[in-house]
Structures are given as C-alpha cells and as structure tokens.
Amino acid sequence: LNTLIKIPITILSLCCIFSCKTQHFETPEYGKNEAEKVFEIKKVHNFRAVGNIKNTEGRTLKEGIFYRSAHLHKLKKKSFDQIGQLGITEVIDLRNSKEISQSPDQIPNGITYKKYSAFEDEGDQLSQARKLVLKGKVNASDADKRMIDFYREYVTENPEIIKTIITEIMESEKPILYHCTAGKDRTGIVTALILMILKFDKETIYNEYLLSNNFRKPLVEKRLRLANNLHFLYPKMDLQVLEKLSWIEKRYLDAAFEEINKKYGSIDAYIQQVLGISEVKRAQYIQKFTH
C-alpha cells in the first residue's frame, strides 16, 4: 500500500487544473480508549507501546515491554537515541523478503534484528495486485475479500513461523519492538495473539487493534487526498480500493479468529497446539507481563 502510488511532488501543482471530481471517503472505526503511549519518532509511523490495559483477571499489562510500529526504513540516526531511551534491545521484522530488500530497517548498533515472515508473497502477488489496482481491475469488494483472506491465512498457513514469532516476543527479557510495513495488519494480528495469551477480553483486544486507525489518521487522510487530487493520472483506479487498504476493520480480525476456531476448535486450543503454550506456561507469561 505504501508504495502503491509513487508520483513526483512537482505534479501536485497540476492538481487543481486536472482534478475536478472529489471522492467521498467513509469514516473508519476508531479505537475508543487511547490508553497507550504514542511516541513521535520522525519518519516512523504508528509507533506505540502496548500497555496500560487490564485483562480479565484484573491485572494490568506492564508498560515499556511491548512496542509496535510501521517499518523503520526511514528512521533517522538522530532518532536512534529515542529508541535507546526506551530500552529496546531487539527488533522483529514481520515483512517478507522483498519488502525488506526494498526498504531495509535502519536501526542503531547493538540492537538485535530478526525477521520472520509468515507471508512470503510467492509469485509476487502484491506487485501484481498493485498493477491491477492502478488499472481499475480491482474494486472495493475485491479488496475487502483480499483483506479477509489475508487475515485468515496469516494465522493458519505457516503455524511454525507464527509460533516462532510469538515465542521470540514472549521469551524476551527486555523491551522488544515488532513491526510490519504499516504496523496495522500483521503487527495487529501478532498483538492480538499476545493479548489473547495474556487473557485480555475481546473488547480490549479490538480496541487496541483499532488504535492504528487513530494514530495513522493524519497519514492516511493525506495520502487519500493526494490520490484523489492525482486521480487523473490513474483514472481507472477505484479510490475506494485505496481507502479499503488504508484502514483496518474489526471484521478483518474477526476473520482471523473465526479461521482459528474453524481449524482448531477454539483460541485456547490454538494457543496450546500451534503456539505450544501450556496452561502452566501461559500463567507464567501472565505473571511476567502483568501486575
């Protein structure tokens, strides 16, 4: 999505001349409780701490342990100190090989970097889909189905990688940052699984998930306005598709949980069978990460 349209800024001056149609964009669903700390780190979007929320046992998730964000490709060296001040010692990159090669993370020396892709995009489907979008051969309904399918497949197609990701995060003894490209889908799913393990209810989990819409709002609205103004360059492109791919919806996370229930019977069974976390280990994690 972030590289869907690459257009020189100088063309912006032509917008008022060639663009006359204004697209109406829907209002996304936002998280209602902004309890998490958001960090303004230049050129890094959706960077926040997962914490300050209560689970079903009344215990509060400790702050300063789990951090999530979008990619770190544009992280500036002068911002390295901010990462260091948070005590982050490890970064987990959830992107696929091509995404990483095109936009590698820029991280401070001394931080451990690991990459685990549960979606390797064989056949370069993302690139092909991008071309179809620009040619107007993908509509909003198609985009919605693609998102639903992606969420379903992410949690079940490569269970060993998902297990590795979760284990790496949960076994960490120091603050850890994990991210994908936009920090909303793959990162959102991983966060939801972590919170499920730690026995947070669905309302809390979904609220945390939807906060990506809150914190990405300025960026997304700017991109949608730009796409609308420059629509004359790609007149066949359905702008509602771009909108659909820019926000997240509860239904997407629903699809992931429904697929887990369908394939494994329950979330608890998935936690034990796929993630390899026993009830004893789960209780230990709850003690470790909450108070």
Language model features: what each stretch is:
Residues 182, 186-187:
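Ser/Thr-glycine-rich phosphate-binding loops at phosphate-binding pockets of nucleotides
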Residues 1-26:
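Bacterial Sec-dependent N-terminal signal peptides
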Residues 179:
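Gly/Ala-rich beta-loop-alpha elbow adjacent to hydrolase catalytic centers
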Residues 20-176, 190-291:
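Cys-dependent protein tyrosine phosphatase-like superfamily
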